[in-house]
C-alpha cells in the first residue's frame, strides 16, 4: 500500500470508498495522476511550503535626468507584475557603483517590491552616470538622489506614494540629508553604516595630508580621493543638526567592528530621530558583503558575508512599513 503526501490542489472521485473508484490528483503543473482506491492506504494533505514565494526578478537599465546630466541605474522588479509597487531607491557608498547594491535590490524585488540602484554622478571612476569625481560633493549627490526620486515617481511600475531610500555609508549620509526635504514625502529610510562621521574625518585628516587621495589621505580608505570642494562643504558641518526632523520610520544597520564609521555615530543618530531603530551586526566591519567593502573594509572581519542577517532585517522593515 502506498501513502500519498499531497501539497497541491486535488480533486477525488472517492475518499477511499469502493474499490472500483479512483483517486485523482491534479497538480498545479502537469498531467493528473490517478490511483485505484485499492492502491491507496491514506491521504495526507501537507501545508504548502515557502519554496514558491519568491518572485523571478526582471532587471532593466533605466536612465534618470538631472538637468543636462544623465544618471545611470538599474530597475529591479518582480517579473510579470504590472501593478505599481512600493519602491526602494538604493544609494551606494563612496567609490562604488549601483552594482554594489545588487544583492539588496534583487532581494527586494524577489519579495515583491520595486528597487532602483543608480550610480551617483562622479561617485567613482567607474560611474556610468555623467559627471566627474572632481565635481562630486555631498550636495551634488543629494541633487542626484532627488532627481532619481522625481523620475521614478513617473513610472507606471512605481507607487509614487510609497518611496523609500536605502543608503550605505556615504550614500546613507546623503539619504538622511535628502529625507529632510519634506516635499519628497519619503515613507522611510534604511541606512547601512551611514557616514555621519565625514566632518570629523576631514578635521582629523587635515592634520595628516588631507582627505584626498595619495599617501596619508583618508580618501584612500574609500578607494579614491576627494576634491577640495567636497572637503570645504563638509568641514565643520554638523550632521546631527541637519537630520532628525524626518519623522517616518528609520532603520539603521551597523557592524560592531566597523573601523571606518564607528557604531557610536549611528547610536547618536537613533537618539536624534523621533522614530528610529538600530540593529548591530556582530562582527561586521564597514560593508556587509564583498561588493560593499571600502579599501580598509576587509579588515577586522568584513570579509565574511553578513547578508544572511542583514537582508531579513530589510525585508522585515519593508513588510511592516509597506505591506504588499
Residue ranges and their predicted role:
Residues 52-80:
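N-terminal cap/lid segment of alpha/beta-hydrolase-fold proteins
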Residues 85, 92-96, 256:
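Active-site glycine-rich loops that stabilize anionic/oxyanionic intermediates
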Residues 94-106:
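The serine-hydrolase catalytic nucleophile loop
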Residues 100, 134-156:
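Alpha/beta-hydrolase active-site loop
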Residues 107-128:
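Conserved alpha/beta-hydrolase
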Residues 177-229:
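Hydrolase active-site cap/lid region
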Residues 246-247, 252-254, 258:
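Short beta-strand/loop motif that positions the catalytic acidic residue
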Residues 292-324:
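Catalytic active-site module of serine/aspartate enzymes centered on a nucleophile-bearing elbow/loop
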Amino acid at each position: 500500500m502506498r501513502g500519498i503526501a499531497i501539497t497541491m490542489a486535488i480533486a477525488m472521485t472517492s475518499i477511499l470508498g469502493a474499490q472500483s473508484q479512483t483517486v485523482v490528483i491534479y497538480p498545479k503543473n502537469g498531467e493528473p495522476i490517478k490511483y485505484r482506491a485499492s492502491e491507496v492506504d491514506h491521504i495526507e494533505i501537507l501545508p504548502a511550503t515557502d519554496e514558491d514565494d519568491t518572485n523571478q526578478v526582471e532587471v532593466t537599465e533605466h536612465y534618470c535626468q538631472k538637468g543636462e546630466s544623465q544618471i545611470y541605474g538599474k530597475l529591479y522588479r518582480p517579473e510579470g507584475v504590472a501593478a505599481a509597487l512600493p519602491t526602494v531607491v538604493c544609494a551606494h557608498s563612496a567609490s562604488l557603483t549601483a552594482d554594489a547594491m545588487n544583492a539588496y535590490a534583487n532581494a527586494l524585488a524577489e519579495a515583491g517590491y520595486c528597487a532602483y540602484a543608480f550610480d551617483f554622478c562622479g561617485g567613482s571612476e567607474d560611474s556610468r552616470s555623467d559627471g566627474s569625481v572632481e565635481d562630486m560633493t555631498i550636495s551634488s549627490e543629494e541633487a542626484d538622489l532627488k532627481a532619481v526620486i522625481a523620475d521614478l515617481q513617473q513610472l507606471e511600475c512605481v507607487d509614487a506614494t510609497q518611496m523609500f531610500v536605502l543608503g550605505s555609508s556615504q550614500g546613507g549620509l546623503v539619504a538622511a540629508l535628502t529625507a529632510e526635504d519634506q516635499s519628497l514625502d519619503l515613507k522611510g529610510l534604511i541606512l547601512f553604516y551611514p557616514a555621519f562621521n565625514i566632518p570629523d574625518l576631514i578635521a582629523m585628516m587635515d592634520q595628516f595630508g588631507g582627505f584626498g587621495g595619495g599617501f596619508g589621505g583618508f580618501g584612500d580608505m574609500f578607494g579614491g580621493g576627494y576634491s577640495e570642494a567636497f572637503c570645504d562643504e563638509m568641514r565643520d558641518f554638523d550632521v546631527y543638526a541637519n537630520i532628525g526632523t524626518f519623522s517616518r520610520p528609520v532603520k539603521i544597520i551597523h557592524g560592531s567592528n566597523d573601523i571606518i564609521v564607528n557604531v557610536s555615530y549611528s547610536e547618536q543618530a537613533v537618539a536624534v530621530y523621533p522614530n528610529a531603530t538600530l540593529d548591530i551586526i556582530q562582527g561586521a566591519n564597514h560593508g556587509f558583503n564583498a561588493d560593499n567593502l571600502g579599501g580598509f573594509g576587509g579588515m577586522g572581519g568584513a570579509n565574511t558575508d553578513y547578508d544572511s542577517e542583514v537582508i531579513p532585517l530589510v525585508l522585515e522593515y519593508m513588510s511592516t512599513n509597506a505591506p504588499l
